[in-house]
C-alpha cells in the first residue's frame, strides 16, 4: 500500500478528526458558499431538495452550492441532480475532511436535521434549520426516552440563526420540547415548507401523472410510519402485517386504480411487488413531494406527511390497524382519532373509502397545521437568508422574563450526591428562575433510566458530545494534569480549547449563573473554569483525599477551577480546610448544607423491598426478606464500593463481633465503585461469611435500612455522609468514624463517633450492644430553610 493510499484511507476512516479544530480556527468564512444537508446526507429530499432547486436560479449564480451525502448515497444524490438538471459546486461525504472544511468555511448552513456533535458554528456563519416535519410523536424533553440523547438536536436548534416553522402547532410543540422561549436567541420564520409549495400547484401534479404514464388512472399512495428496530427488519411483525394487508387491498382495487407504496428505507427492500396487480413501489427517480402532488389520495397512519398533504385538500385516510398498541407505546401530542380524516383498521375499509368522494377539509385544521403555507415562500426564504432581504414574516419567541440558571448534575448515579441534588430541586422555588439541569448524554447511554429521578416538568440541557481533542491540546492537557504547568503556551491552548467547547455545547445561550453541582469530572470542571457567566462549584467530599486516590478529578484542575469560581460551596464545615489547601483561597467559600426530604425518606422506607434489573447480590431477594424478618440483629452500611468507604474495615470488625454474637448479620448496600468483587472476596474469606450480605445497585435501600437495628459508617473521609441523616430520620441508631464530614454532623447532633480503625468500629458495636449508642435527631425543616436561603442568596435572588 502506497503512502498516498494510506493517507487517503486515514482521511476516509475519520482518524483525521482532530484536524477539525485547525480547520475551525484557520478557515475563513466564505459568505458565498452554501452548505445544504438533508437527513444527515441520506439523499437529496424534501425541503433541502426544494431549496437546491431555488438556489439554482440565475439570481444565485455567484454562490457555491455544496451538498453533503452519507456513505452509500452519493449515486442517489448525483442522479437526482442530473434528473432535474441541477448543479452543485461540489458534493462532499458527511464526516470526510472535505465535509468539515466546508462546514468551517460555508457562510450559510442549511439543514433539515442536525449537523454532527463535533460541529461548532463560527462567528459570521448563518444557520437555517428547516426541521424535517411537523411532530406528532413527542420529542425532546416531552419524550422521557429521548431526554438523555436530545442534546445534539437541542444545540443545533439553539445555534440556528433562523428556524422555519410552517405552522402554529409545530412552533408550539418544538418550542416546548426544546425549551426555545427561554434560550433561543435567533429568529423564527413563519413561511411555508419549501417541499409543500408544490402542493399549491395542482397543474404540476397533472404533469407528473402524465410523466408516470397514469394520466387516466386514479393514483393513491400508502406511506406508513416505520415500526420496530432498524436491526431487526426480517423479524419485525409489522412488516409481515403490511405484506398481508397489501395483498388483501390489491384484490379490492379497481382496474383504473394504482397504489404506490413508500415504506421506510429500513423496510422498503423487505417487500416484493411482483405479486401485485395494482400496487407498485414508489418511484425513487422523482422527488417524493412531486409524486405526492400527483396522487388523488394519501393513506397513512401516524406520519407527519398527513399535515403536508392536507395542503392539497384531497382525501386522507388513516389506516391505523394497531392504534391502541402504537398510542400506548409511544408518546404523541394529539389523538389522531380527533382529526377530520376517516380512521379505519382493515384493508376492506380502506378500499371502500377509496371509492367514495372526498369531503372538504375543515378550515380549523388547515389554520392549525398549514398556517403559513403560500405560493412564493421558498423564494422568500432564500432571499431572506441568502440575500439578506427583509421579505419573510419574522417572529421572536417571548420568554417568561426569568433569568436562566444552569445546573450540571453529573450522570445521576445512585449515590448521596444525586439524592442531595434531587432534594435541592424539591426545596427551591423554581418559579423565580428557569433552572436547566445539565448532564452528559453519553454517560447515560447505558442507563437512561437514571433520569427517572427528575420528577415533574423539568428543563434539561444535555451535553451532546465529548471533547474535540487534537494532538497538541491532548499533549498540553497531559502535561497540565501531570505537573499543573500553565506556562509555555499550555494554559493558552487549554483556554482556547475549552472556550471552543463551551461554544460548541451552549452557543449563545445566556445564564445568570452556572453551577457544577456534581463537583467531579475533569472535563466539566475545566469547562466551568472557562464559563463566561458567574459560576459556582459544589464540593461534596474531602477532595484532597479524593485526588490522592483518583485521577478524576485532577488536583490541578480543582486548584484552578476553585481559584476562579465566584463561589465554592461546601456541604459541611469540615471539608472547607481541604478546599483552601487545594486552591489557597478561602474568600469564595460558602457552606451550604444538603437539603433533606424527610417525608420522601419515610415514604420510600414504606415501599416493598425489591431488586432492580442491574442489582447484583450474594443472596436472593427471598433470602434477604427472610433474614430481615427473623429475630436476629442486623447491622447495615450503605455507600459505594470504593476504597474510602473502608468496607474491609467494617467486615474485619464485624467478623470479630460475630464470633461473640452469631445471631448477628451485616448488610452492605453499595452503588457505583470498582471494589464489589474485592469486597465479596474479603467477606468470603472470614468466619462470618454466611452472615454477610453484599448488594450492589439497589434503587431504594430505605426499606432495608428501616428494618435494621444498627447503622455503621466506616469511611476514611466523607463530605457529609447524607446516609447518616437518612438513618436518623428512620430512627436507626448509628456510629460513624471520626473523620471530616461525619464529625461535624455527629458532634452537632450528639451522635457517637469512633476511631477510624477496625478496633474503633468493633468498640462502637460493643457500645451499641450495651445500649450506649442512641439515635440522633436532625431538624430537617430548619436545615432545609438554611440551605435554600443560602442557595438563593448565592444566585442573588433571595
Residue ranges of predicted features:
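Glycosyltransferase donor-sugar binding loop
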Residues: 67-71, 258-267, 438-445, 596, ...
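A conserved mid-protein helix/loop that constitutes part of the nucleotide-sugar donor-binding site
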Residues: 46-50, 230-247, 416-423, 633-656, ...
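Short hydrophobic beta-strand element within catalytic cores of glycosyltransferases
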Residues: 298-299, 315-326, 724, 733-736
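Conserved donor-binding/catalytic core segment of Leloir-type glycosyltransferases
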Residues: 31-37, 215-231, 402-410, 613-645, ...
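Carbohydrate-associated surface elements
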Residues: 169, 194, 574, 595
Amino acid at each position: 500500500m502506497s503512502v498516498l493510499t494510506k493517507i487517503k484511507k486515514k482521511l476516509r476512516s475519520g482518524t483525521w478528526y482532530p484536524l477539525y479544530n485547525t480547520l475551525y480556527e484557520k478557515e475563513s468564512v466564505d459568505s458565498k458558499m452554501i452548505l445544504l444537508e438533508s437527513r444527515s446526507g441520506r439523499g437529496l429530499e424534501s425541503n433541502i431538495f426544494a431549496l437546491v432547486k431555488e438556489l439554482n436560479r440565475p439570481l444565485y449564480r455567484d454562490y457555491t452550492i455544496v451538498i453533503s451525502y452519507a456513505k452509500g448515497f452519493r449515486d442517489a444524490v448525483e442522479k437526482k441532480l442530473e434528473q432535474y438538471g441541477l448543479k452543485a459546486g461540489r458534493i462532499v461525504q458527511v464526516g470526510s475532511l472535505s465535509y468539515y472544511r466546508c462546514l468551517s468555511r460555508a457562510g450559510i448552513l442549511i439543514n433539515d436535521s442536525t449537523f454532527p456533535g463535533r460541529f461548532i458554528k463560527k462567528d459570521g456563519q448563518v444557520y437555517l434549520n428547516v426541521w424535517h416535519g411537523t411532530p406528532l410523536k413527542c420529542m425532546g424533553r416531552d419524550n422521557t426516552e429521548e431526554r438523555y440523547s436530545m442534546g445534539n438536536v437541542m444545540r443545533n436548534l439553539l445555534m440556528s440563526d433562523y428556524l422555519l416553522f410552517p405552522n402554529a402547532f409545530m412552533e408550539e410543540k418544538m418550542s416546548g420540547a426544546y425549551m426555545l422561549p427561554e434560550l433561543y436567541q435567533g429568529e423564527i420564520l413563519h413561511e411555508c415548507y419549501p417541499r409543500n409549495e408544490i402542493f399549491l400547484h395542482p397543474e404540476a401534479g397533472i404533469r407528473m401523472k402524465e410523466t408516470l404514464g397514469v394520466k387516466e388512472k386514479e393514483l393513491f399512495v400508502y406511506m406508513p410510519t416505520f415500526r420496530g428496530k432498524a436491526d431487526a427488519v426480517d423479524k419485525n411483525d409489522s412488516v409481515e402485517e403490511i405484506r398481508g394487508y397489501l395483498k388483501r387491498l390489491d384484490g379490492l382495487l379497481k382496474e383504473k386504480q394504482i397504489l404506490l407504496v413508500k415504506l421506510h428505507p429500513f423496510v422498503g427492500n423487505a417487500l416484493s411487488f411482483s405479486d401485485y396487480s395494482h400496487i407498485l413501489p414508489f418511484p425513487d427517480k422523482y422527488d417524493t413531494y412531486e409524486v405526492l402532488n400527483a396522487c388523488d389520495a394519501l393513506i397513512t397512519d401516524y406520519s407527519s406527511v398527513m399535515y403536508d398533504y392536507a395542503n392539497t385538500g384531497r382525501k386522507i385516510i388513516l389506516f391505523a390497524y394497531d392504534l391502541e398498541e402504537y398510542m400506548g407505546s409511544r408518546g404523541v401530542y394529539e389523538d389522531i382519532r380527533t382529526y377530520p380524516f376517516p380512521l379505519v383498521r382493515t384493508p376492506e375499509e380502506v378500499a371502500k373509502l377509496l371509492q367514495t368522494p372526498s369531503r372538504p377539509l375543515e378550515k380549523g385544521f388547515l389554520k392549525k397545521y398549514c398556517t403559513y403555507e403560500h405560493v412564493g415562500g421558498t423564494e422568500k426564504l432564500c432571499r431572506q437568508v441568502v440575500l439578506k432581504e427583509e421579505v419573510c414574516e419574522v417572529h421572536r419567541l417571548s420568554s417568561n422574563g426569568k433569568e436562566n440558571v444552569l445546573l450540571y448534575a453529573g450522570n445521576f448515579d445512585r449515590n448521596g450526591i444525586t439524592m442531595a441534588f434531587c432534594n435541592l430541586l424539591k426545596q427551591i422555588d423554581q418559579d423565580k428562575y428557569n433552572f436547566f439541569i445539565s448532564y452528559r448524554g453519553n454517560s447515560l447511554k447505558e442507563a437512561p433510566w437514571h433520569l427517572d429521578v427528575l420528577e415533574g416538568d423539568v428543563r434539561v440541557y444535555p451535553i451532546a458530545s465529548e471533547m474535540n481533542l487534537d494532538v497538541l491540546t491532548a499533549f498540553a492537557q497531559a502535561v497540565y494534569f501531570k505537573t499543573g504547568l500553565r506556562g509555555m503556551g499550555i494554559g493558552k491552548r487549554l483556554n482556547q480549547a475549552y472556550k471552543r467547547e463551551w461554544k460548541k455545547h451552549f452557543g449563545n445561550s445566556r445564564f445568570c449563573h452556572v453551577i457544577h453541582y456534581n463537583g467531579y469530572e475533569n472535563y466539566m470542571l475545566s469547562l466551568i473554569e472557562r464559563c463566561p457567566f458567574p459560576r459556582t462549584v459544589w464540593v461534596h467530599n474531602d477532595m484532597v483525599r479524593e485526588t490522592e486516590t483518583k485521577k478524576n478529578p485532577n488536583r490541578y484542575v480543582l486548584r484552578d477551577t476553585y481559584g476562579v469560581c465566584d463561589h465554592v460551596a461546601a456541604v459541611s464545615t469540615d471539608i472547607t480546610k481541604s478546599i483552601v489547601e487545594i486552591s489557597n483561597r478561602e474568600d469564595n467559600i460558602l457552606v451550604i448544607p444538603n437539603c433533606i426530604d424527610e417525608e420522601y425518606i419515610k415514604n420510600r422506607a414504606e415501599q416493598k423491598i425489591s431488586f432492580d434489573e442491574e442489582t447484583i447480590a450474594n443472596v436472593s431477594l427471598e433470602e434477604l426478606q427472610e433474614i430481615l424478618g427473623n429475630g436476629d440483629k442486623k447491622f447495615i452500611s450503605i455507600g459505594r464500593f470504593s476504597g474510602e468507604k473502608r468496607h474491609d474495615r467494617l467486615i474485619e470488625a464485624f467478623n470479630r463481633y460475630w464470633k461473640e454474637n452469631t445471631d448477628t448479620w451485616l448488610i452492605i448496600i453499595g452503588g457505583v465503585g470498582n471494589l464489589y468483587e474485592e469486597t465479596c472476596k474479603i467477606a468470603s474469606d472470614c468466619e462470618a461469611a454466611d452472615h454477610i450480605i453484599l448488594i450492589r445497585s439497589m434503587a431504594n435501600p430505605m426499606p432495608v435500612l428501616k428494618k435494621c437495628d444498627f447503622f455503621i459508617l466506616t469511611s476514611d473521609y466523607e463530605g457529609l455522609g447524607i446516609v447518616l441523616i437518612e438513618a436518623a430520620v428512620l430512627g436507626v441508631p448509628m456510629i460513624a468514624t471520626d473523620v471530616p464530614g461525619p464529625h461535624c454532623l455527629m458532634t452537632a447532633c450528639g451522635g457517637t463517633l469512633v476511631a477510624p480503625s477496625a478496633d474503633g468500629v468493633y468498640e462502637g458495636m460493643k457500645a451499641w450492644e450495651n445500649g450506649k449508642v442512641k439515635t440522633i435527631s436532625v431538624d430537617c425543616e430548619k436545615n432545609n430553610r438554611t440551605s435554600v436561603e443560602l442557595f438563593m442568596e448565592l444566585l442573588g435572588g433571595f
